[in-house]
Amino acid sequence: VEVEAEGAWSGTLRLSADGRVWEREVSLAAGLQTVELDAGLEQPRLWWSRGLGGQHLYTFRAELLASGRQAAARQARTGLRSIRLVREKDEWGTSFYFELNGVPVFAKGANHIPLDSFVTRVTRERYEHEIASAALSNMNMLRVWGGGIYEDDAFYELCDEYGILVWQDFMFACSLYPGDEAFLANVRAEAEQNVKRLRNHPSIALWCGNNEIDTAWSHYLEDAGWGWKKNYSPELREKLWADYEALFHELLPEVVGRLAPEADYWPSSPMQALTRDANQHAGKRTSSGDIHYWGVWHEAEPFERYTLNLGRFMSEYGFQSFPEARTVRSYAGEREMELLSDVMLSHQRHPSGNKLIKRYQSMYLPEPKDFVSFLSVSQVLQGEAMKYAIEAHRRRKPFCMGTLYWQMDDCWPVASWASMDYFGRWKAIQYYAKRSMKDVMVSIDGTKEGEVDIHIVSDVPEPIDGTLHAALYDFDGKLLKRFSAQAKVEANATAVVWSSSVDGLLEGADPKRTVLKADLAADGRVLDSKLHYFVPAKDIKLSKAMVTIREVAGSNGTAFTLETDTLAKQVALFAEAEGVFSDNWFDLIPGIPVTVEFLGRGAAGRAFAPASPGRITVQSFADWIEL
């Protein structure tokens, strides 16, 4: 217990929690000091991240008493857990994963930026909407990006409650910083204040020195980095690097080690390790440390590169889309609804972002019939890109043990990498992420030429003994083939449970009008389902689908069943009310209905609860392209 006393003082320190009380006599001197008190809980309830267990929180209260009267008191709500960043030599290089209460955790989530450009406008409700959305999307980690802010207490309290681990950057990003004594003293005070403020939150998993500065400067590789070094003489380079090391290799780790000795510190994201040689800096594909992979998007590489360029922990990667039309119309009039209008370019912070979205759309998806349709198609494109990445990362477990895409939220209404727009409306990618981050996931991999592999990825601590049921359909819903296979997966592991050549699977069926459906069943229920197509989406032969929607009897207008007469791709439901559907932006096969529930934002005093969506608009690719 840390105590600051104005002068000498003697009395009793009392600590209480969960009905237990511990006391000791203390004598304090003037100034700041730490007093230790042994306290033990028999059979404590541990704090777990979402998906591994409950998020039990204890309230510890400390009091200073003199003659039975309270002189000072403070309480903290915290969870009991052990967490460490495991970096150990293995068959591939050096591991990089988090171990919570002795259990290896595959980190699934996104990067968090400030929720508003004007942070005073952010409310607890907005924080809860984001963090509840992360939990509902099967995430277990958010990375607080070093180019933003040290977040409000409410953010961390909610991460504690929802079981979302926090990778916490110190607030340094994409720039070099001074190393003079006055600046370092200022940084030390800021770091100490924030480490003390946040160290009792069980959600804090890691302290990271900065965002991308190590890789941007790449001190030990002359031709690497972002080109900064060429602007400086050798002498000035050494001075700048010495300043960098003083801040990120000395000051910040010392603060963390002194004030939060059980916490881990990582100097910069991304990097391989603190080796002080050329092996320190991260690349596109490394066997140690973490990676920010931007070949897809910034360098216009194809989605398929996600399966090749990965490492031990993917802490940043992403792809842009536009928000839905309702959000775009909050900043653009009808005359400005064009890809390269001044308003659209002003609401795009990447120098060629809108053109890049269009370029990728031409590579992978059919041509939208107008700009409003392009908005929806761009969201499908983003979702497909992130599905490619997330599932590639998860299939490579335990080599890869983390996937955090850029980014979860937006600070203003804009075309961006976010999975929720400024108003908190889920884009298609949020539903894609929810499906691709399920604790038990079916992943169908068609990236090998002429082959299809079906993987089961499990993040649960128990083995799975189930059955894979798969079927081949044409787009009219005709069953072409059915087969099954045993699906056994060890606890917290992955397995390929079925493989086939494409030719052997199709047996002459038209690849442009055929879909594979795979379901994993165990203990009498379906754990996950996935669809797979045999040609890119732009090449499949779609017909005009008639999608019907009906209310589920007895649901009080909160649940709905959808059916179609021919394959409907990317069925998107838009509700009048603010909220989310249990599933959305999915494909419908004739004869296989899908039932969804609407969860209203803030309904029944909760972040999400069943509610009426009001008017529902149903769209699909058939509405966005010319057929």
Predicted regions and their residues:
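Secreted/periplasmic carbohydrate-active enzymes, especially glycoside hydrolases
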Residues: 1-141, 283, 395-396, 400, ...
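Residues that line or immediately flank small-molecule/substrate-binding pockets and catalytic motifs
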Residues: 82, 112-114, 146, 211, ...
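Generic hydrophobic alpha-helical scaffold/packing signal
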Residues: 131, 195, 253, 379, ...
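Active-site neighborhood of glycoside hydrolase catalytic domains
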Residues: 161, 177-275, 423-424
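Substrate-binding clefts and catalytic carboxylate motifs of secreted carbohydrate-active enzymes
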Residues: 207, 214, 247, 251-464
